[in-house]
Structure formats: C-alpha cells, structure tokens
Design a protein with these regions (language model features):
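A short hydrophobic beta-strand element
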Residues: 85-89, 118-124, 150-152
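A broad, low-specificity signal marking well-ordered, structured residues that form hydrophobic/aromatic
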Residues: 24, 45-47, 104, 122, ...
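Hydrophobic ligand-binding cavity/cleft-lining segments
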Residues: 1-95
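A conserved amphipathic terminal alpha-helix motif
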Residues: 12, 16, 159-190
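Hydrophobic-ligand binding "helix-grip"
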Residues: 96-144
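Residues that form or immediately flank small-molecule/cofactor binding pockets and catalytic motifs
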Residues: 31, 111, 157
Length: 190
C-alpha cells in the first residue's frame, strides 16, 4: 500500500486485518533456517555487539521490542506486537515522500541455549501486500568466546511492479535498512 500521507492507526488495523489470513507470498516458508531457494537475492550481514551476558540480554530485549525497525524512516506497526509465530505486522516506511505499508508474518522463533552458546531471534515472511517477496531472519548470538553478534539473513526478490521497475533503488534501500538496523541494535545493546 502506497500513500502520500502517513497511514492512520485505523488504516494500519484495516491493512493488517486484510492480510492476516492470507498465505505467504512465496512457497519456501522457513527457508532461512537452511538453504535459500534459487531465484532470490540473498543478503547476510552481521556485526559484533560486544561481549558478555549483559550485552546479549540487552540485544535480546531490543529484538523483542522491534528496535531493529526503530529507524525513523522504517517502523513496525502497530508498535509493541509480541513476537509469536503467526503474528502479522506491517512494516511502515517513508521513502521519497511516499509512505508504504508492507505486510509480513512471523514464521518461527528461535530461543536456544546450549552450554555456553545462546541464540534468540525470529524470521518473518512476506504476505501478498508487500513490495518484496521472501523471508528475513533477525538473530542475536552469544558464542563460547563470550562474543555477542547481531545477524540479519534474508532472501528476497521484487514483487510489486514499481519495485521491479526500480530494482536498483530497491536494493539500495534494502542495504540502507541493513546498515541502519545493525546500528540500531549496536546502540540498544550498549
């Protein structure tokens, strides 16, 4: 959904409601757990957040509160949605003076702790009213060497005709999102 004005809360509720029961817009649901499917652009980015349990806990809290989307030009609406498989959200973005809402649903959660390793995160997948088609995983990892990492892994391809037409611009916006998301979690974990 594109608009010249910011969508109201009512618009957001109506948009999410219209997408809530629809199937994912791609058939390889859950593929961010394994190998990405052919025919998609794959992005894998990570940054070291620091060391220790406090850093890990702060980063986990940041993910639970959607801080990786608290970027000024991109947000999750409605804010405060719980991380649960099946939850539908909208990614709201303002780019080039236009507002957009993009529907996504949480595919799976990760909450693992084994010996001195821990990992927390989730993946969401695109729904029919999203400009892209694919899946994105956000994880925080705490390794045996005490290092803590934030990892973003995604596969996608353009779905909306305007995004297909302007795919180089869309790729730059995806790269901007990654850079800003990494910076947001770095800041939140300190």
């Amino acid at each position: 959904m594109f608009s010249l004005r910011q969508p109201s809360e009512k618009d957001v509720r109506k948009f999410i409601s219209s997408q809530q029961d629809l199937p994912f817009s791609y058939s390889q649901v859950g593929a961010t757990q394994n190998q990405p499917p052919p025919g998609y652009t794959v992005d894998h980015n990570r940054t070291k957040l620091g060391e220790g349990e406090q850093t890990y806990q702060r980063a986990v809290s940041a993910l639970k509160n959607w801080k990786q989307f608290d970027l000024g030009w991109v947000t999750i609406v409605p804010p405060g949605k719980l991380l649960e498989a099946g939850t539908t959200v909208a990614v709201q973005a303002k780019v080039f003076g236009f507002w957009s809402l993009n529907a996504a649903r949480i595919v799976y959660l990760i909450d693992e702790r084994q010996n001195l390793n821990a990992r927390f995160g989730f993946a969401y997948g695109t729904l029919p009213d999203h400009v892209e088609c694919g899946e994105e995983r956000f994880t925080v990892e705490w390794h045996e060497d005490d290092s803590v990492w934030y990892d973003i892994y995604a596969f996608s391809r353009p779905q909306h005709p305007l995004v297909k037409l302007g795919s180089p611009i869309a790729r730059r916006l995806q790269q901007r999102f990654v850079k800003d998301s990494l910076a947001s979690i770095v800041k939140a974990s300190r």
